[in-house]
A protein has these predicted regions:
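Alpha-helical recognition/docking segments in bacterial nutrient-uptake
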Residues: 1-10, 65-176, 180, 238
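Bacterial carbohydrate/catabolite-sensing allosteric modules
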Residues: 1-6, 50, 91-96, 144-150, ...
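Short gly/ser/thr-rich secondary-structure transition/capping motifs
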Residues: 50-56, 109-110, 129-132, 258
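N-terminal helix-turn-helix DNA-binding module of bacterial transcription factors
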Residues: 1-66
Length: 294
């Protein structure tokens, strides 16, 4: 049985022969050496384009001891908030002379860990973890190998940096707002095991207690997804004591909750007030008009 093979990839030797120069000169050009005359550089680059030659990124990283690539793990590609942050990461990386290589964790700690290992095998120069489902102790092991920044985790670790807002305070502000509107029966759709979701749940409970509403605390299991928000809202609507307001752990889940309310014929905010979190672009649409914590 014969097996078909793709066309042979051009090598640095092929480029040297096409340009009529030495292999070492081609190597200097590919490593952006300032010791190459402009005419020779142009000839090498032209030959490389004609042949479709691309330098081996792994080999270059071994020589330079850096890849020029930052690995970025997003826990959920479907979350617009994460997409907005990833866009900013890509722009900042580009300005710093780096490329960002994105990978997804799919809200699954095991898959997220596997994605990190793959990025480490690709010799990325640093790792940015957005909305990680992993505990900080696990992340700290990788931080001992390369620089790591976690977004959404508050870390006091000496081996990694963290970027986060005060999720607990934001959730407290959301409940304070609803109480100021006159609501007393305020439920919460929480976001599951994500670190930020746990902090937002604490903020909800703290604010309810501060307003003397601890007996009214009602936290319904959900997730940082539209399906998670919709299913949790359906659970709420099936009860006999329906709250007058619901604080949802993030905007994506709040959109799902809005959809469930719409299907049930419940008008927002006339019959039930809803507050989300993250201030994603969709929440700003006039057709949605979702109150959210920025």
């Amino acid at each position: 049985m014969s097996s078909a093979r793709g066309p042979r990839r051009p090598t640095i030797v092929d480029v040297a022969q096409r340009a009529g120069v030495s292999k070492s000169l081609v190597s200097l050009v590919m490593h952006d050496s300032p010791r190459v005359a402009p005419g020779s550089r142009d000839a090498v680059l032209r030959a490389a384009r004609e042949l479709g030659y691309r330098p081996n990124a792994v080999a270059r990283s071994l020589v330079r001891q850096r890849s020029g690539v930052l690995g970025c793990i997003l826990s959920d590609l479907h979350n617009p908030y994460f997409a907005d942050v990833a866009d900013g990461i890509e722009e900042a990386a580009s300005q710093g002379g780096y490329r960002a290589l994105l990978s997804a964790g799919f809200l699954d700690p095991a898959r997220e860990g596997a994605a990190v290992e793959t990025l480490l095998e690709l010799q990325v120069d640093g790792l940015i973890m957005l909305g990680s489902m992993l505990e900080l102790d696990a992340i700290a092991e990788w931080a001992g190998q390369i620089p790591v920044v976690v977004i959404g985790h508050a870390s006091a670790s000496d081996v990694m940096d963290s970027v986060t807002d005060d999720d607990e305070a934001g959730a407290t502000a959301a409940v304070d707002h609803l109480v100021a509107l006159g609501h007393r029966r305020i439920a919460h759709i929480h976001g599951g095991a994500v670190v930020s979701a746990r902090a937002r749940r604490r903020g909800y409970e703290r604010s309810m207690a501060a307003h003397g509403l601890a007996a009214n605390v009602r936290s319904v299991p959900g997730a940082y997804t539209e399906d998670g928000g919709a299913s949790a809202m359906r659970v709420i609507l099936e009860t006999t004591d329906i709250p007058t307001a619901v604080f949802v752990a993030n905007d994506l889940a709040a959109l799902g909750a809005l959809d469930a309310l719409d299907h049930a014929g419940v008008q927002v905010p006339a019959e039930l007030s809803l507050v989300g979190y993250d201030d994603i672009v969709t929440a700003q649409s006039p057709r949605v008009a979702l109150t959210t914590v920025a």
